[in-house]
Amino acid sequence: YGVVAQMFAFLIPAPLLLFLTGGRNYTFARTESRYLVLACGLILLTLITFSLVYAALDIKPSQLAYLDMKDILKNKGAFLFLTAIIVPAYEEWIFRGLLFGILVTESTRRREAVFATIFVSLLFTAVHIEGAHSLSALPPIFAMSIVLHLMTWKSGSLWPSFCAHSLQNLLAASTMLAAAAKSAAR
């Protein structure tokens, strides 16, 4: 229940943040399709880069996260929907929509936006520590967050970051399901 508790911990102040910002944040506004393609491509490039670095250094992510997943195997569709759609939409709205939107406005200087990106990316990474089960998973999460922020800032919309985040979570969830199925078969 750790991840669910974290989500609710962020959900409680979210309406207050929305009210206090007067709607001054990033939303799921229309955006150019090139930003969607670019965001997904950058996330895939980030994942491939970290996979190659980890393979070269013989770093293996912890399998602990996959061993407790027998219940998830009972309802794969709900797990994939929650992981690939609901969680990314929620996290994008909270981290890039509200928090980043509060810190970065149209008049924000580039340097301030970089600091805001790093700060919110550190928060995003911190929220994912419990689910990572390995310190080696944190650098890719941080890098992914930086990429998602840049896409949101450049496009002015949450759609590119949501699509890229959904793709990343779908790949991770599929890997988890495959590992859980393999572990359950033993």
For each predicted feature, which ranges?
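Hydrophobic alpha-helical membrane segments
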Residues: 9, 46, 143-147
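Transmembrane helix-loop-helix hairpins at the membrane interface
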Residues: 76-186
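Helical transmembrane-bundle signal
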Residues: 10, 47-48, 124, 169
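Alpha-helical hydrophobic membrane-insertion segments
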Residues: 8-15, 37, 52, 114-115, ...
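Structural signal for the C-terminal ends of transmembrane alpha-helices
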Residues: 15-25, 151-155
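Alpha-helical transmembrane segments in multi-pass membrane proteins
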Residues: 1-21
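Juxtamembrane helix-loop-helix connectors linking adjacent transmembrane helices
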Residues: 1-2, 21-87, 105, 180-186
